[in-house]
Swiss-Prot record:
GO cellular component: a single term: cytosol
Self-association state and partner proteins as the record states: Interacts with IscS. Certain pairs of proteins can bind simultaneously to IscS; IscS-IscU-CyaY complexes can be isolated in vitro, but (IscS-TusA-CyaY) complexes cannot.
Protein name stated in the entry: Iron-sulfur cluster assembly protein CyaY
Organism listed in the record: Escherichia coli O157:H7
SUPFAM superfamilies linked to this entry: Frataxin/Nqo15-like (SSF55387)
A Gene Ontology molecular function term of the record: ferrous iron binding
NCBIfam families referenced in this protein's UniProt entry, alphabetically: FeS_CyaY
Taxon lineage: Bacteria, Pseudomonadati, Pseudomonadota, Gammaproteobacteria, Enterobacterales
Protein keywords: Iron, Metal-binding
Keyword Metal-binding: yes
Pfam family, any one: Frataxin_Cyay
Role summary: Involved in iron-sulfur (Fe-S) cluster assembly. May act as a regulator of Fe-S biogenesis.
Matches recorded under InterPro entries: CyaY, Frataxin/CyaY, Frataxin/CyaY_sf, Frataxin_CS
Length: 106
């Protein structure tokens, strides 16, 4: 994968997350902001999830209250380089815990 393809795929991921949060109708307030390639999700309780791209490694990084995760693209899924879990699964787990209710990015 070259740098431009990586950026296109990361931008697509950011857009999907932003669209899901815009459409989300849960009880708690969740805000999403993109600034300089960093996507920040802020929850009503003040906690945050930070998602950024690491261009030199062609990775997406996810920082949550539970820890930090690095993802490589395998096929059409971003996969954690340690646990083998998908980006969406880990993001949903963290967002659900931090929001206090089920949050889905599917």
């Amino acid at each position: 994968m070259n740098d431009s393809e990586f950026h296109r795929l990361a931008d697509q991921l950011w857009l999907t997350i932003e669209e899901r949060l815009d459409d989300w109708d849960g009880d708690s307030d969740i805000d999403c902001e993109i600034n300089g390639g960093v996507l920040t999700i802020t929850f009503e309780n003040g906690s945050k999830i930070i998602i950024n791209r690491q261009e030199p490694l062609h990775q997406v990084w996810l920082a949550t209250k539970q820890g930090g995760y690095h993802f490589d693209l395998k096929g059409d899924e971003w996969i954690c380089d340690r646990s083998g879990e998908t980006f969406r699964d880990l993001l949903e787990q963290a967002a659900t815990q931090q929001a206090g209710e089920t949050v889905s990015f599917r």
